[in-house]
C-alpha cells in the first residue's frame, strides 16, 4: 500500500507490535555532476548509488538508518544509533528487524541521503572542515579517498577538480 501522508503510514496496523520503525537510507552520489545547479536536490540527483562490496564492508554506511520510536517507552538503550536493544524494531513493511546489519530494505520506504552532491559542492563542504577532524592533509585525503570515491566514479575531470581546489 502507498501512503500520501506520514500519519497514515505510522498509523498502519502492521506497526501495532512495533516499538520502533527503522527506515534505511538510500544513497545518492554526484550523478557525474561537477558543478552546482540551482534546482532542487531531487531533480539534480535522480540515480541512486549502486551498493558495492566496498560500501557493504562499511557497516555504518551500509546499515545507516533513521528510527521512528513509539512514545512512552522507558529504558531504551541504543546499542547502534538507530537500532534499539530489547525493543521490537520493525522495517517499513512491518517485519521485525532482527539485526541492525541486515541488508537495507528500500521496498516500502527509504530516506534519500545525498552524500556528496556535485564535485563542487563536496569541495565547498570540505573547505568548511568537519566536527570530527581538524582541517589537515589527513582529513582531506580521508574524505576524498575513503568517502567521495566510495559513492562516486573516479574520472579524470573530478580528480583534476579535487586536486586543484
What are these model-derived regions, one by one?
Residues 1-165:
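Catalytic-site signature of metal-activated, phosphate-bearing donor transferases
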Amino acid at each position: 500500500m502507498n501512503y500520501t501522508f506520514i500519519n497514515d503510514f505510522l498509523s498502519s496496523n502492521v506497526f501495532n507490535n512495533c516499538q520502533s520503525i527503522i527506515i534505511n537510507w538510500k544513497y545518492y552520489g554526484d550523478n557525474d555532476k561537477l558543478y552546482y545547479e540551482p534546482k532542487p536536490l531531487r531533480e539534480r540527483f535522480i540515480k541512486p548509488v549502486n551498493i558495492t562490496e566496498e560500501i557493504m564492508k562499511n557497516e555504518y554506511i551500509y546499515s545507516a538508518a533513521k528510527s521512528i520510536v513509539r512514545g512512552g517507552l522507558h529504558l531504551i538503550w541504543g546499542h547502534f544509533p538507530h537500532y534499539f536493544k530489547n525493543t521490537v524494531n520493525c522495517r517499513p513493511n512491518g517485519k521485525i528487524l532482527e539485526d541492525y546489519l541486515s541488508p537495507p530494505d528500500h521496498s516500502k520506504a527509504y530516506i534519500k541521503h545525498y552524500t556528496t552532491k556535485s564535485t563542487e559542492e563536496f569541495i565547498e563542504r570540505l573547505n568548511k572542515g568537519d566536527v570530527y577532524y581538524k582541517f589537515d592533509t589527513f582529513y582531506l585525503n580521508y574524505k576524498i579517498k575513503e568517502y567521495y570515491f566510495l559513492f562516486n566514479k573516479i574520472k579524470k575531470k573530478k580528480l583534476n577538480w579535487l586536486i586543484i581546489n
